[in-house]
Amino acid sequence: MKKIILVAGGTGGHFFPAVALGEELIKRGYIVHFITDLRCKKYINKDMKIIFYLLDLKRFSNILLFLPTLLIAFLKSIKLIYHIKSCVIIGFGGYPVIAPMFAAIFLRIPIIIHEQNSYLGKVNKFFARFAKKIAISYEDIKNVPEFAKSKIVLTGGIVRKNIRELDSFIYLASQHCPTKLTKTVLTNTLNHFVKARNNKFSNCNIFTLFIFGGSQGAKLFSELIPASIEILMKKQPNLELKIIQQASLAHQVKIKDIYSKLNITYEFAEFFDNIALQYKVANLVISRAGASTIEELTYIGLPTIFIPLPSAADNHQYYNAKLLADNKAGWCLEQNNISAEKLADQILDLISNRQLLEDAAQNLLNRKQEGHLLLSNLIEDTVFL
């Protein structure tokens, strides 16, 4: 059986799309090996049929400290990849892929790059000259060098299996309530609105906000969101609101006190193990704008207010969110310019005008791609045909 190596690490945003691709490749009969770093160890599930290897590669701002670590990782990668004897290596960007990708080039193994963001990252840009193909998630991607444009193939983002198993959601302004559409119904009625309501949304008087900050940057949300909700409830005191929010244990006590005084129903977690459960009940999401988050929300058509993480590499989260906002598929509020008052006004505007949610859901679904299938096809066409 032919072997394929996936290389991704750093955050769940890189890790989970790579796993989704690996699962599809296994279904097609390939043996999939996955090289990642120690930070992603917590995401590895023993039930996965992928063979994992962990590299100890830390990120240093000082290049003199980083180079010795990189050299050790490079030598380990050469030894590992040589013994695996892979036909191709797929890199998902980020500094943890540097050593394995250099090793692949040294061993003359073909490489394919997947860029999840709307802005080609530094690592992927560097390896673009060596890649057979560059798979992208956004048609109007930025920062692609001229020499690499002929290698570009639009495959779309890659979404986890448990998210793909959710039905798409579309918003009915007349009912003020999300309605669940199967893929078949969605295809046949994209320009019409179904009247049937899903039982999970039978209580349409309650508006559910789902708030999460990902593995980075949830602290701001623990301070900004409660202040915004206080303002919102003063402006709309009769609003029936439910909040599902990611927050550290240290912040939960203070936030619970605020929400309790406002008579708001709430749920908290430090980390959502199966985020699909929260997506299923949300009317509106407030989140960061990491690539995998955006792809998941796009796949199910769930409207979102994005607050990009300003410290994200190459400011890619801003470009991701801005692209959706420009296409009326979401809302982008920059952290440096945001205030509790502005966020409260934005939430109130959307609650008061459900047509905006409905339109955003439609526009999200229009951008939906089956990235795990398209990238698998690209790999087979590029390397095995």
Curated annotation (Swiss-Prot):
- Known catalysed reaction(s)? di-trans,octa-cis-undecaprenyl diphospho-N-acetyl-alpha-D-muramoyl-L-alanyl-D-glutamyl-meso-2,6-diaminopimeloyl-D-alanyl-D-alanine + UDP-N-acetyl-alpha-D-glucosamine = di-trans,octa-cis-undecaprenyl diphospho-[N-acetyl-alpha-D-glucosaminyl-(1->4)]-N-acetyl-alpha-D-muramoyl-L-alanyl-D-glutamyl-meso-2,6-diaminopimeloyl-D-alanyl-D-alanine + UDP + H(+)
Q: Which UniProt keywords apply?
A: Cell cycle, Cell division, Cell inner membrane, Cell membrane, Cell shape, Cell wall biogenesis/degradation, Glycosyltransferase, Membrane, Peptidoglycan synthesis, Transferase
Could you provide one GO biological process annotation from this protein's UniProt record?
A: lipid glycosylation
Q: Which Gene3D superfamilies does this one have?
A: Glycogen Phosphorylase B
Q: Where does UDP-N-acetyl-alpha-D-glucosamine bind?
A: T11, G12, G13, N117, R160, S215, Q317
- Return the EC number: 2.4.1.227
Molecular-function GO terms, alphabetical: UDP-N-acetyl-D-glucosamine:N-acetylmuramoyl-L-alanyl-D-glutamyl-meso-2,6-diaminopimelyl-D-alanyl-D-alanine-diphosphoundecaprenol 4-beta-N-acetylglucosaminlytransferase activity; undecaprenyldiphospho-muramoylpentapeptide beta-N-acetylglucosaminyltransferase activity
Primary location: membrane
Please report the record's description of how this protein sits within the membrane: Peripheral membrane protein
- InterPro entries in the cross-refs: GlcNAc_MurG, Glyco_trans_28_C, GlycoTrans_28_N
Q: Does the keyword Cell inner membrane apply?
A: yes
Q: Which SUPFAM superfamilies match?
A: UDP-Glycosyltransferase/glycogen phosphorylase (SSF53756)
Give the metabolic or biological pathway: Cell wall biogenesis; peptidoglycan biosynthesis
- Which NCBIfam families does its entry note? murG
Identification of the protein by name: UDP-N-acetylglucosamine--N-acetylmuramyl-(pentapeptide) pyrophosphoryl-undecaprenol N-acetylglucosamine transferase
Species of provenance: Rickettsia typhi (strain ATCC VR-144 / Wilmington)
